[in-house]
Amino acid sequence: KLEQVYYYGAGCTSYEKKNVLGASLVAQFKTPIQVESDLLAAARGLFKCEAGIACILGTGSNSCFYNGKIIVKNVRAGGYILGDEGSGAVLGKHFLSDVLKGLAPKEVMADFFEKFRISPNEVMESVYNRPFPNRFLSTISYFLADYTSDDYVYELIITNLRNFFTRNVCQYDYKNYPIRFVGSLAYSYAPILREVAGDFGIELDVIEETPMNGLIDFHSLNTVSYTHLRAHETDSYL
């Protein structure tokens, strides 16, 4: 029998949402449930019980200052329209904007239309009229990963990551605490991410694709056996 279930998911920050989701999980598992946010999962996975600045770069982006127990400061992410600097969705948004206006290199644009088998009108349709446009935009980041040797693409990535530092990381006491990253985009662009961090005088010692291994270590240190752990693979990490 499970003694405890820990569930981490996107948007699980309010008491109302935690209670609703927790009640559903209690009915399913018949055991005590603790529901927390994906951001706390990132912080615990990256830092265990140490203090530091945890950052997520995936489809979306987020960050927080974690004191080793709880999140004490969080710069609001804002979503891919008003924020999410450094994320795959925002990188894709800027690239597609340049593509639609003919500002991206012709060779890169031609390869994009060939590989995605999509027209400019279909791009507009995917962004404005279909579900989950942020996920569509984020898929562009995987395409761009093959073109980092192109000056235009490289600068696009650099600018996106630099905006994450200036608008998010720099709002924390980043000179006095370690900074670590998790998420598919952070992991895919790790060398460039380290380069941008270096411009801010930051040395990154940890960049993970997911927080799961660190979370397992965290809970093995803080809970008894027979605990079930689930970190929902949200847009933040993917």
Annotate each predicted stretch with a short phrase.
Residues T227-T234:
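Conserved small/polar residues in nucleotide/adenosyl-binding loops
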Residues C12-E107:
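Phosphate-binding/catalytic loop of phosphoryl-transfer enzymes
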Residues K1-T13:
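N-terminal short beta-loop-beta anion/metal-coordinating cradle
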Residues K1-Q4, A23-A27, L46-I53, H94-S225:
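ATP-binding/phosphotransfer module of carbohydrate and carboxylate kinases, centering on a glycine-rich
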Residues C12, L185-A186, A231:
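Hydrophobic pocket-lining residues within nucleotide cofactor-binding pockets
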